[in-house]
Design a protein with these regions (language model features):
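Alpha-helical interface subdomain recognition
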Residues: 1-77, 81-82, 90, 98-103, ...
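Short glycine/proline-enriched turns and hinge-like loops at secondary-structure junctions
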Residues: 62-63, 130-132, 156-161, 174-177, ...
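A short, Trp-centered hydrophobic/proline-enriched beta-strand micro-motif
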Residues: 114-122
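Flexible, small-/acidic-enriched active-site or ligand-binding loops
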Residues: 133, 186-217
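Long, acidic (Asp/Glu-rich), low-complexity accessory segments flanking structured domains
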Residues: 212-231
């Protein structure tokens, strides 16, 4: 399906913002391992903290394709920023779908306005793709809940104002015994135990969170008791589509740098781009980027049309994330030695993009999903 005028407008506006505001600052934020909070306000002013959230709740009222396009363009400016925005929109979407009116008023509107930053706390030290195996417990305590457990690799776990935390409320019920809670990060017992030292995306903090007798009010239960697993899975498709879009954006940034360098740098008396080996490499890079873009847009448009898209979302994420790492590696190769030093952006983009094959379901999980879909075709 062709993109509409709304989609072209958001692509143009976010691309302009990414090139003027994010690209010039990305290397410094990476070195400092810091994302300035004032940037969240700028993003919110463009509607990017609640792209698919209705206007009545402070959002931009756009569709999932618009969100994915925005993520792509943000990632072309800075991968870490796109991750922060992506998770914030994930939290906003969960609050929209499962939050009470009071929870939406208290949390969703401020998130969309850039006043609050959200985190998604599902993964645990020994639990990754199998969400049903979490061990964090939530027990009734007085008039509320007491949480105990450890969450691992939580994006914005330190800098967020609130986290959607998943915990077991009835072990005997298995998946149906998992619930979700809105946990303020200033709640007693919410402890940032460690900030991970990562290969890339340094400006986006990734934390280990310890919940130690963390007490929250009863009204912080999200949805209803026992629907946490359903909440966790409800955003699988959009999460994977957005990571695919993010991968395409970072690949595009690496490609832009590579083609600019290939036109400027001369070798054996002519620009690099005039050497067939280099032009062929660039041709493959451009083809992969466009293929990844079409895959994620197709999946996003299926979701907006209310049609099943689990297989298509997995295809988009699998292809785009692996393509993006290859494109970034090729961009380094085109730069030669300069590609391996921090004076040029491609080494940072290469570090940033590697994780896209891991989070929101590793590549082999995507292959498993696609394979199962084909078995039933």
């Amino acid at each position: 399906m062709p993109l509409g005028e709304q989609h072209e407008l958001i692509r143009d506006s976010v691309r302009k913002f990414a090139r003027e505001q994010l690209r010039p600052n990305a290397a410094r934020w990476d070195r400092e391992s810091h994302f300035p909070r004032e940037e969240l306000k700028r993003l919110a002013a463009m509607g990017l903290c609640g792209v698919a959230i209705p206007e009545e709740w402070g959002g931009a009222g756009m569709d999932h394709a618009s969100l994915a396009i925005a993520i792509e363009e943000l990632a072309s400016g800075d991968g870490a920023t796109s991750t922060i925005v992506q998770v914030n929109n994930l939290v906003a979407g969960i609050l929209l779908g499962y939050g009470s009116s009071a929870q939406k008023q208290r949390h969703l509107k401020p998130i969309a306005r850039g006043e609050l930053l959200g985190a998604f706390a599902l993964t645990e030290p020994h639990v990754g793709s199998d969400a049903s195996a979490i061990t964090t417990r939530a027990e009734r305590a007085g008039g509320g809940w007491r949480l105990n457990g450890v969450k691992q690799f939580i994006t914005s776990g330190r800098n967020a104002d609130l986290a959607i935390v998943f915990a077991v409320t009835d072990k005997a019920e298995g998946k149906k015994g998992i619930s979700a809670f809105v946990v303020p990060t200033n709640a007693p017992g919410y402890i940032v135990a460690r900030i991970e030292e990562k290969a890339g995306q340094h400006a986006s903090d990734t934390a280990q969170i310890v919940l130690e007798n963390c007490e929250i009010p009863a009204e912080n239960l999200l949805g209803a008791e026992g629907v946490g697993y359903r909440i966790a899975l409800s955003n699988l498709e959009s999460g994977r589509v957005n990571v695919a879009a993010q991968s395409v954006g970072m690949a595009q940034a690496a490609f832009d740098a590579a083609i600019a360098y290939a036109k400027e740098r001369k070798s054996f008396g002519k620009p690099l781009i005039e050497h067939q080996a280099v032009s062929f490499r660039l041709a493959d890079m451009a083809t992969g980027i466009e293929a990844g873009r079409q895959l994620y847009l197709h999946a996003a448009q299926l979701r907006d049309a209310g049609r099943p898209c689990l297989k298509e979302a997995s295809m988009a994420k699998l292809f785009a994330s692996e393509m993006a790492e290859k494109v970034c590696s090729d961009a380094i190769q085109i730069h030669g030695g300069y590609g391996y030093v921090s004076d040029f952006p491609v080494e940072r983009i290469w570090r940033d993009v590697r994780v896209t094959q891991i989070y929101e379901g590793a590549s082999d999980i995507q292959r498993l999903v696609i394979g199962r879909a084909l078995e039933g075709a």
